[in-house]
């Protein structure tokens, strides 16, 4: 699938005070290590908290819907997974990965909204200004947008920094099959929110 807009963004769309309040709220929760179908520190090293807060969904949904339409993707989505609050401190990272895959959630999943569906749209919200940390770049790879389901990227040739995400309150929306990573943080702390919108498998 070749896209005209591999990602869509809204600069400083979330007010600073809301970003600050979210950081304050979720850093008070007990976090756990982020996983990739099981703990694997070679792929991922970050701390996460998951939330079903209705206010988060209400905040995120309009950006997802607008990006899905304005970017011309028009993906069939009908449910959003639990929102993830992520914290990256020094030496933490998330290596190359895709959020989506060809394998749908099982039909017996405890959440009815997940059953038989796959991740189609990923949304990332920057809660920290880039001046507060070093490293921690959010990068995408456009070398092969059709590489859905592969386990790793080899001979990466088309990496791009998503500079917009170094601005606090910026929202970036992209198809879940886009390869992306967060480079190691070398100083400071990077906070973000991530959500995934799901729908029936590709036809």
Predicted ranges, named:
Residues 1-173, 177-203:
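Fe(II)/2-oxoglutarate oxygenase catalytic core
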């Amino acid at each position: 699938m070749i896209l005209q807009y591999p990602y869509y963004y809204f600069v400083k769309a979330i007010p600073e005070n809301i970003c600050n309040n979210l950081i304050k709220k979720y850093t008070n929760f007990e976090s756990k290590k982020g996983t990739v179908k099981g703990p694997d520190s070679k792929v991922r090293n970050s701390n996460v908290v998951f939330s079903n807060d209705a206010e988060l969904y209400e905040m995120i949904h309009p950006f997802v819907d607008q990006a899905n339409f304005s970017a011309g993707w028009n993906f069939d989505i009908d449910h959003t997974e639990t929102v993830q609050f992520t914290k990256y401190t020094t030496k933490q990272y998330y290596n190359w990965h895709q959020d989506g895959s060809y394998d749908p959630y099982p039909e017996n999943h405890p959440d009815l909204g997940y059953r038989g569906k796959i991740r189609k749209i990923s949304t990332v919200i920057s809660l920290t200004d880039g001046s507060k940390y070093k490293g921690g770049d959010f990068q995408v790879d456009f070398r092969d947008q059709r590489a859905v389901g592969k386990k790793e990227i080899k001979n990466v040739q088309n990496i791009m920094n998503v500079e917009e995400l170094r601005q606090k309150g910026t929202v970036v929306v992209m198809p879940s099959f886009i390869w992306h990573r967060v480079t190691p943080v070398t100083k400071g702390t990077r906070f973000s929110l991530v959500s995934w919108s799901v729908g029936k498998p590709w036809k």
